[in-house]
């Protein structure tokens, strides 16, 4: 007869339970269950929609050992764990470690039992290490609510041979051949919330040994313990919010790395260099600036003129005249009218002569007499429409005086209107208001200036109007299918103008039908004559 007896031990970690029974074949069998690996902590997974996706198992996974001994006593008997022909499985259930006193008012805590999720049943695996025995492993057990719990393991046996059956069945509710043998409980363990969970520990040596023999156990090589805040003056709230602090520290580290990678654009040392920037390559050959205290003259406000008239002197200083691409474009539009004084004689200078220096320039101390403010900076860019207005003004003033315009193309065929390298050397000239227009220029002619004008704005006679081209025979939908725009009431329908007597003036006979073709013509079709 089966006589169960639970003998707890005082071991620190292992919990042992024993059971003895006598079979029909008069065999004395001893069962011994030992919890080799106790659960220590777990994280509550909750009962929401994300409970199954974000679930942590009990750490470390519980491992229970089973030994079967045949003999008069457990110490004198023979170990028949591998020779005994039967199947065993262990079922795990969860219970509170501290008994809850019953109260008069029912609360959700007392009504809802602790919920264990995962795989609560395990079959026995025969392993050689750490010792030859049968082992039950629970690698996938989770608890839904936080608290202090313990696991209860129930051992069931499925007997295969009749001589190993019990003399008297212990439980009539179980199917024949399945018997409940014994149960064992683990030590209490804590289930933390997701905020307070300290993290998973490194896998134990027992878990690694079991996994090496083919059992499905998750192995963690590193410690995944949450780092606590160890700052001075911290309280319990800081320890509880360790996850938030770790996130903030990581954010601060990312900010520091980002600030270390950022580069600050250095400030310009020369303030004049910022104002003189343009799309030209003048920065590569920039000459030294002249004295800041010098008053801006009218020469600085205009780009260099074309070669024919020795009018402007674009060289306020010798180094700037020789620099390529110094001027970035027309500064101001050309004046509309220029008042000239015929009393001044201009001596022509040969083209290959030396260039006058800055001290010999007659514009060094001359004010701008044409109403332009001398307070404007010489490098102020002008708007783009000034070129067209200059071309229009030049047509009106060609009879008296033709001012050089920056929009006229140079005779060398260059399209850079803002570069001095496109023009030949320009001779020195007198101030503008005292220019004489008498034709004593040698080989210089005004026609050389007017000649490129038709290229800039060609005046072409309008082309004769071409006859209309017949694209196809299709007509617009409105000309063929004209619709009436007035509203329709009481079942009225649109009137077809092709069948109206007033539009076509054609009335077919009763045995004929007319229809409109695609080209707009009316065709007649003869109906078949049937006798009724």
Swiss-Prot record:
Domain Velvet: 26-220
Positions of the UniProt region annotated as PEST: 435-463
Motif Nuclear localization signal, chain ranges: 40-45
Record InterPro entries: Velvet, Velvet_dom, Velvet_dom_sf
Bias (Polar residues) ranges: 481-493
Keywords: Cytoplasm, Nucleus, Sporulation, Transcription, Transcription regulation
Protein's cellular compartments: Nucleus; Cytoplasm
Keyword Transcription regulation: yes
Chain spans, region Disordered: 217-440, 458-520
Pfam family for this entry, one: Velvet
Biased composition (Basic residues): 217-229
Chain intervals with Low complexity compositional bias: 233-250, 397-411
Subunit text: Component of the heterotrimeric velvet complex composed of laeA, ve1 and velB; Ve1 acting as a bridging protein between laeA and velB. Interacts directly with laeA and velB.
Annotated PANTHER family: DEVELOPMENTAL AND SECONDARY METABOLISM REGULATOR VEA, SPORE DEVELOPMENT REGULATOR VOSA
UniProt function note: Component of the velvet transcription factor complex that controls sexual/asexual developmental ratio in response to light, promoting sexual development in the darkness while stimulating asexual sporulation under illumination. The velvet complex hat acts as a global regulator for secondary metabolite gene expression. Controls the expression of the aurofusarin and trichothecene gene clusters. Also controls the expression of the deoxynivalenol (DON) gene cluster. Regulates hyphal growth and pigment formation. Acts as a positive regulator of virulence.
Identification of the protein by name: Developmental and secondary metabolism regulator ve1
């Amino acid at each position: 007869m089966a006589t169960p007896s639970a003998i707890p031990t005082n071991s620190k970690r292992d919990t042992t339970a024993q059971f003895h029974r006598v079979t029909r074949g008069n065999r004395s069998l001893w069962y011994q269950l030992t919890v080799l690996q106790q659960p220590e902590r777990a994280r509550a997974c909750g009962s929401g929609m994300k409970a199954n996706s974000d679930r942590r198992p009990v750490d470390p996974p519980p491992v229970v050992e089973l030994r079967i001994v045949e003999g008069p006593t457990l110490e004198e008997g023979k170990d028949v764990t591998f020779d005994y022909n039967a199947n065993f499985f262990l079922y795990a259930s969860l219970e509170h470690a501290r008994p809850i006193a019953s109260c008069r008012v029912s609360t959700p805590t007392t009504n809802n039992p602790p919920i264990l999720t995962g795989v609560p049943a395990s079959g026995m695996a025969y392993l050689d290490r750490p010792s030859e025995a049968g082992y039950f492993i629970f690698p996938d057990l989770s608890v839904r609510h936080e608290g202090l719990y313990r696991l209860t393991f129930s051992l069931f046996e499925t007997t295969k041979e009749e001589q190993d059956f019990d003399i008297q069945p212990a439980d009539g509710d179980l199917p024949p051949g399945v018997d409940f043998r014994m149960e064992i409980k683990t030590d209490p363990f804590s289930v933390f919330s997701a905020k307070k969970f300290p993290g998973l520990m490194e896998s134990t040596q027992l878990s690694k040994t079991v996994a090496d023999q083919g059992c499905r156990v998750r192995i963690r090589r590193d410690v995944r313990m949450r780092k606590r805040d160890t700052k001075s003056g911290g309280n319990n709230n800081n320890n509880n919010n360790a996850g938030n602090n770790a996130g903030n520290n990581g954010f601060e580290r990312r900010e520091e790395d980002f600030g270390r990678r950022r580069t600050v654009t250095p400030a310009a040392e020369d303030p004049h260099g910022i104002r003189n920037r343009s799309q030209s390559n003048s920065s590569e050959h920039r000459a030294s600036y002249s004295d800041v205290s010098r008053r801006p003259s009218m020469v600085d406000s205009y780009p260099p003129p074309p070669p024919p008239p020795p009018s402007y002197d674009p060289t306020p200083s010798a180094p700037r005249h020789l620099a390529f691409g110094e001027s970035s474009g027309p500064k101001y539009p050309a004046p509309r009218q220029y008042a000239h004084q015929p009393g001044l004689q201009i001596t022509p200078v040969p083209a290959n002569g030396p260039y006058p220096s800055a001290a010999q320039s007659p514009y060094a101390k001359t004010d701008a007499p044409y109403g332009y403010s001398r307070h404007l900076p010489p490098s102020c860019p002008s708007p783009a429409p000034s070129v067209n207005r200059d071309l229009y003004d030049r047509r009106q003033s060609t009879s008296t005086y033709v001012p050089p315009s920056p929009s006229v193309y140079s005779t060398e065929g260059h399209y850079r209107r803002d570069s001095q390298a496109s023009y030949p050397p320009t001779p020195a000239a007198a101030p503008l208001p005292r220019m004489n227009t008498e034709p004593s220029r040698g080989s210089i002619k005004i026609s050389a200036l007017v000649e490129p004008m038709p290229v800039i704005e060609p005046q072409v006679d309008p082309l004769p109007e071409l006859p209309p081209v017949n694209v196809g025979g299709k007509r617009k939908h409105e000309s063929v299918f004209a619709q009436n725009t007035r509203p329709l009431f009481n079942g009225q329908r649109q009137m077809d103008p092709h069948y109206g007597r007033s539009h076509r003036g054609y009335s077919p006979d009763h045995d004929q039908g007319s229809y409109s073709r695609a080209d707009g013509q009316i065709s007649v079709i003869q109906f078949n004559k049937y006798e009724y």
